[in-house]
Amino acid sequence: MSTGTSSTTAKNRIRVIILGAAGRDFHDFNTFWRKDPRYEVVTFTAAQIPDIEGRTYPAELCGDNYPNGIPIEPEEKLVELIHKYEVDQVAMAYSDLSHEEVMHKAAIVNAAGADFRIMGHKHTMISSKKPVIAVCAVRTGCGKSQTSRAVTGILKGIGKRVAAIRHPMPYGNLIAQNV
């Protein structure tokens, strides 16, 4: 039975689940949630990457607010996780879902008692004083990496200095991939 009060921790932090696909969710965490003392990210969920459930986003990448890292749990347990962790907000961190899929997830989250939010670029974009070329696609596997390598090669070929960045992906050792 709901009391109508927030289920925040004793420190009055807003408890958050980041709903994602093991990519943008890590990026959103690193750029917005990681250092913000108002929020406590209690878990990531995953649905698109095989065998990622049960892993932990490493403490070494989480910062001081998360000395034990953050667990990655199966998205199909979302409602259970909202109740288990007494979650206040679920933040959508997918980039490749249809409107129907997004709103279905929002309805599930709201029915379980949590707020649903989608982060905009204002809070998650990495700032740069240099010109930027962004390589984006609608789905995983569309060729972003190959396209990025080709663009990098062209720019280097005309004498430009190039730096390529991407959000963390859960393939291999995330700590070793840190820059």
Regions found by a protein language model. Name each.
Residues 12-87:
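A solvent-exposed beta-alpha-beta segment
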Residues 49-55, 97-101, 172-174:
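Short, charged/polar "capping" segments at the starts of alpha-helices
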Residues 29-36, 106-108, 151, 179:
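Short, solvent-exposed amphipathic alpha-helical segments in soluble enzyme
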Residues 154-179:
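ATP-dependent carboxylate-amine ligase catalytic core
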Residues 134-151:
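Glycine-rich phosphate-binding P-loop
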Residues 15-19, 134, 163-165:
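Conserved beta-strand elements of the Class I
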Residues 124-130:
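Phosphate-binding P-loop
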Residues 58-122:
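Phosphate-bearing ligand-interacting subdomains
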